[in-house]
Amino acid sequence: MMVFQSFILGNLVSLCMKIINSVVVVGLYYGFLTTFSIGPSYLFLLRARVMDEGEEGTEKKVSATTGFIAGQLMMFISIYYAPLHLALGRPHTITVLALPYLLFHFFWNNHKHFFDYGSTTRNEMRNLRIQCVFLNNLIFQLFNHFILPSSMLARLVNIYMFRCNNKMLFVTSSFVGWLIGHILFMKWVGLVLVWIQQNNSIRSNVLIRSNKYKFLVSELRNSMARIFSILLFITCVYYLGRIPSPIFTKKLKGTSETGGTKQDQEVSTEEAPFPSLFSEEGEDLDKIDEMEEIRVNGKDKINKDDEFHVRTYYNYKTVSENLDGNKENSNLEFFKIKKKEDHFLWFEKPFVTLVFDYKRWNRPNRYIKNDKIENTVRNEMSQYFFYTCQSDGKERISFTYPPNLSTFFEMIQKRIPSFTREKTPSDQVSTYWSFIHEEKKENLKKAFLNRIEALDKEWSVENILEKTTRFCYNEAKKEYLPKIYDPFLHGVSRGKIKKLPPLQIITKTYRKNNIGRSWINKIHGLLLKINYHKFEQTIEKFNRKSLSIEKKLSFFSEPQQEEKIHSEEEIKVFKFLFDIVRTDSNDQTLIKNFSDFHEINKKVPRWSYKLISELEELEGENEENVPMEPGIRSRKAKRVVVFTDKEPHDEIYTNLKDNQNSDQKDEMALIRYSQQSDFRREIIKGSMRSQRRKTVIWDFFQAKVHSPLFFDRIDKLFFFSFDIWGLKKQILRNFMWKNKKKNFDKKEEEQSKIEEKRRIEIAETWDSFLFAQIIRGSLLVIQSILRKYIILPLLIIIKNSVRMLLFQFPEWSEDLKDWKREMHVKCTYNGVQLSETEFPRNWLTDGIQIKILFPFYLKPWHKSKFQASQKARLKKTTDKREKNDFCFLTVWGTETELPFGSAQKKPSFFEPIFKELKKRIKKLKTKSFLVLSIFKERATIFLKVAKEIKNWILKNFLFIKGKIKDLSKRNKIPVFDSREIYELNVNQTKKDSIISNQMINELSVQKKSMEWTNSSLSENKIKNLIDRIKTIRNQIEEISKEKQNLTNSCTKLRYDSKIIESSKKIWQTFKRKNTRLIRKSIFFIKFCIEQLSRAFFLGIINIPRTTIQLFFESTKTILDKYIYKNQENGEKKKKKNTIYFISTIKNLISKKKISYDLCSLSQAYVFYKLSQIKVSNFSKLKDVFEYNIRITSFFVKNQIKVFFQEQGIFHYELKNKTFLNSEVNQWKNWLRSHYQYNLPQIAWARLVTQNWKKKINKDSLVLNPSLTKEDSYEKKKFDNYKKQNFFEADALLNPKHNFKKDSIYNLFCYKSIHSTEKNLDMSIGIALDNCLVSSFLEKYNIRGIGEIRHRKYLDWRILNFWFTKKVNIEPWVDTKSKKKYINTKVQNYQRIDKITKTGLANQKRNFFDWMGMNEEILNHRITNFEFFFFPEFLLFSSTYKIKPWVIPIKLLLLNFTENINVSKNITRKKKGFIPSNEKKSLRFYNLTKEEKESAGQVELESDKEKKRNPESALLNQEKNIEENYAESTIKKRKNKKQYKSNSEAELDLFLTRYSRFQLRWNCFFNQKILNNVKVYCLLVRLKNPNEIAISSIERGEMSLDILMIEKNFTFAKLMKKGILIIEPIRLSVQNDGQLIIYRTIGISLVHKNKHKISKRYKKKSYIDKKKIEKSITKYQKKTVNRKKNNYDFFVPENILSPKRRREFRILICFNLKKKTVRDRNSRFDKNIQNWTTVLHKKKDLDKDKKNLINLKSFLWPNFKLKNLACMNRYWFNTTNGNHFSMIRIRMYTRFPIH
């Protein structure tokens, strides 16, 4: 029963899954989604629903809905039916349909009497309206424009179509889904309308009901049609606005329009009659139309930015027979013919492509300049063009098919009706395909084996390696075309070259011989039915010897003598080069098809015009080029000329003025950028901004353009995100008392930021309007004249005249002196000062500022110097520092501290007067104080007397009162019990004293009257009293009842009362806490005093220690002075600043714990942290790594938890308690399916070269003691050193060394990712990854650290890596010095002080003596595992903590030494030549100690040679540099420029080469320099600048430390001064990224037991590809017990060229006949075969030692990932899929699984 139930349940699940995945359900779902893409067609539908009523209204509704549904149905059918899709999908058809219809509709609704209706009846008119409604809904549904920014929902159906087999069913189901969604939407709209009608609040609106607005409402209802049409028109205009209009766009001038000489016409290329059919890097049809005429200088042969075309001639009937013998005339005649053809072609072009060319150039494509060639390549989107092509021998849809091929194929089909291709059956195609590839494989195998045999025969390597041919266009300098543009390296379908002899030699016989030959390419594949098998056999029959090829190509100038190649070897080379394939010459069948073809050009997709940006035009960098208009929009900027030097001071200027404009040379200019956001973003002029990718403007006022990816990082508006946490933080911050000061500072900062923003806005508004700067500039000048010469003199006159009237002395001289001191300096818009008289250039258009120096303020009187006291003087100096002695003038005549700032408050004229008055009033008060005190004393005496009199009167009055009481008691008569009544009344009245005050008063009066009545009171009066008491009681009861009712109604406390109560409670608690604090504050103060006293006494105790230290230092300095008398040693002494207290701080810092966040937990980080831990601690982690690092906190020991938390690896307190999985299961399964990759353990071990296995046992490694010394290595080093060049770019010209550093860096990346084993063996990996260390050890001599390398957990020897590719940290060099340090256990700073001083005679080592530190590294056993991962940085870090200034960050990256040998005998002026030894050259320090010692004393041979022939040395240097930098744009611009200083040349060289770093100024220095520039510009123009210079230094505007900078400052000095800072740029280097990807996949290839070190087998290998022989000989010398094995190459396949290598590997990898492993697109784990494993299984295979593979590399790691995973270019036969992704493959059709 249970089984039956489970069976039913399983069937149900599978049934449900099938239903969900069925075409109908998916179609319904996607169709339903398309309803949400609301377009303007919904406007018509809604209008028909909302507005129309009655019979006509219902008809309109019906017609609207039918039209709407019909339109949508047509759209769905167009997905399936191709012609309809083409008709509706093309943008020009939609535009042509939309524009006239929109205009018609607009005029129809806006003009009532537009049509003369005449005698039409009402029914006819109504029917016409209904038809119009139907048409509106139908047509607008077809228009493919959307209100929403993306129409993704509508396109989902199109996307899913490619995965469906039953397409028609899918289309119908999606339409039904859309219909359901539409019905639901319309029902919802109807419900909303009903709700509006029924809702009284909306209907009974005051405005609608009032008579005043009834007319407006009716008018609105009548003109609804017009409003709808206006809305519709706006949306359609918005849509059309996204397309650039073909008439008004800005056309850029191509280089062909600039004109040219005869030479230009000779080399110019013409437009091909057919599209470029050899598209390689994703060309488009629009690239065909772009032609470029190559401009050639008279001297040079060909520029770098030339465009080369490889031509293929089919026959030569067009060439005239009667051509003249002259070459130039013949060429011109030839091109005339071509031009005529092009003229006819222009008429053949359809009108549509001219007007509606949606792929025109002025679409927003970026113009990114290429460093290699100036005319840039088009940077376009990749093509997604679907067409059938052969893949794996069968026809499949390729989505990267070249569109030009498919269009050409369709053109052929249309033009030639008889052209049909018989479809061969798929089996035959696949057999052909597999046969061809098998044959290819066999041929490649043969070639490969032949080359390996040649290796065994010890041929030279140059003959064995397969060479790639490059296109060389400068033989002298060996300059090549870049690989991208090289026609020889550009794929199978490139154009083939067949050279003609010169035109005059063409004869009839030549034609007869050559008429049957033609070349085969992809076009022939489309046109011909070729028996491929037969054709492949005929290739080999062709006799290559008959071929003769010219050496020179057609685009070079013709040589005088024709050189022909007849040798067999050269013909073979050219055969390989051009890949010539020809049919049999007897076969004449092919000629008929090609009789009309003349030539086909292969064009590089470049821009046909050379654009410059506006910024380049401003900078004037295109001085060499023809002056041209900028074509690229840059950020708004203006060129502000700061200083013009009309008289040249140096002789150098006279040399430089040749062929250059002297005015431009002698002026200094700054570029002023606009502060507003840059919406241009290097856009080309004429292109549309709205279609710029990755730009979204989503706000009304947006400061910057943002990509939609980063929306979550922008501070959004309130309704976008409600940040509760931020609010909570703000509330807490406000309530905290401690943060009051911080808040105040923050407020100030915010205020300053707001002020700055406001200033920038004002500046931009002035800059944006047309004539604003002219108006502002003229107003400022007027204001300055008014202020200086009218207002201020008037004020002086008025003041002094008033003083004279008040009988005061006038102050004419003082005021006039201050007035003359005020200066009005004209400044640029940025505030750079010029002078009083000189206006900045173009100040009316660019803007002006007027700066007032020492502004004049009117004072009521001037104090004499003697009057001012010492206190006043001090106050004056402090005020001076705070107050700036300058201001800027505004348009309104006010003063501001900064340009466009808020107006400053002037010191008031009347303020000192009021102050003086206050002082005098104070004096008067003090005088009157004595009089007041006397009056006060008298008043007190008088009050005392009055008090005594008062007391006496009161006593007498009381005495009389008592006597009267006694008399009344004697005459008293008892009446009832009046006392009781009285008491009762009093008690009751006390309860409600507030309510019944009147009653109490009456009662008291009654009582008194009763007390004082005589006994002769009548009974009537008593009765009246009793009645009165009763009434009062009744009244009291009523009042009490009312009071109860009131209290019951008010039992609920109000919100205000609650607040009052809570505030009372808070106040009470606060009082309580306050008293407690006061009580306990005494103890706290005591504790503070104790701590202070303790610290004080500790300081006193440490005093003798510090004094001893100082004493030792002083003695040491005296000894140094005594010993080292030389100046250089004296300089070194000055730089030995040591602080030893930092060692104590270091200990404190090390004790601090750092808490890590879980977000930083990556796999590399985890293993990096684990690698820093001591080995003994790994015993704790045994349980952790048992279960693949997947643990929950319940089963882990507390000790392990604590350990993890301390190391910052894991936090168990956090919610997410799972580790990241360190293995990649998906890739594992995929690799398991490739069963041929499975190798046993010993095979894995033997995959590495056995020559270089290093025994890790001490017993097996026997060192030869005679070779341990360094003498032999020193000689080698010295020999190597002699070979080194001594120019600026020497360190840059060593590609082998750089390659080595590259691989070490890549290896580190691999190690950090690749460690997944339990024992954390960081050395796991393939043999390829353990390379390069042997040569590293050989070069850097790190053998002193060899004791620690037997540690099995971390193979740290490999991990020496460089931060940069091209720059070297100084290696550990100083191994020769025989001096040992006395005490090895002393502190590091003591070691640094004991560094040897020898060998540094002529070299400035400003920061650190690396030699001694290197010696320590060699003799230093690493016990601190904190730096276990990077042991080379251990000493660096410790010394850096002690001496923070010693090793700045730049010295961990670069080490500069300056070799300055100034010889004054050689003058610079001869030929403008600077000898190399006089240059302050930038060098990367890479010397041995022996060379260091001899550097200052002995001249090396290389230097001597250079001194003998300085010019030849410089030529060699220039040649070397040009080889590396010939293709860079910067060199092109600067090669004609002579540098004024060495630093400029150094910076230029540095920045061109080291693109991994950017240089930036120190931020403080930047501001200082700008301030100095502003002051310099003013001082240069003044005759007596002393006063202003002193005042600017006082104000801190001009910093004197910058004035001390030398004129010719070298780059190294600028670095050392801290002026320039090196910052690493995060560049994405493709090679490194790929290597990391390969090695992540390589994780799954690692065998479990591969690298476990056992007792029997303890060998590891460290391999260097480049220096194999040298390192083998070295290690054979060093070790006695080595066996010799001959291995020639690390990877034998590297013999082949990369293309052949890839082809060979692919062909071997896939079994073409059996097809066992076929499914490369399905999920990875589908094809895992049970009998093959890669990981963790079949350990018995490890014992098999018979069939071991001797190849030293494995197939998989050397593959490029994209080529193996995708097989893009070769396997799928596609042309544009470089960046092939797995997602794209998975989206479309899969391969069938057999």
Swiss-Prot record:
It is a multi-pass membrane protein. Belongs to the TIC214 family. InterPro entries: TIC214. The keyword Transport applies. Keywords: Chloroplast, Membrane, Plastid, Plastid inner membrane, Protein transport, Transmembrane, Transmembrane helix, Transport. This is Protein TIC 214. Part of the Tic complex. It is found in: Plastid, Chloroplast inner membrane. Pfam families: Ycf1. The chain crosses the membrane at residues 19-39, 68-88, 91-111, 133-153, 176-196, 227-247. It comes from the Eukaryota. Its main location: plastid. GO terms for biological process: protein transport. There is a partial copy of the N-terminus (positions 1-343) of ycf1 in the inverted repeat (BAF49986). One of its GO terms (cellular component) is chloroplast inner membrane. Coiled coil: none annotated. Involved in protein precursor import into chloroplasts. May be part of an intermediate translocation complex acting as a protein-conducting channel at the inner envelope.
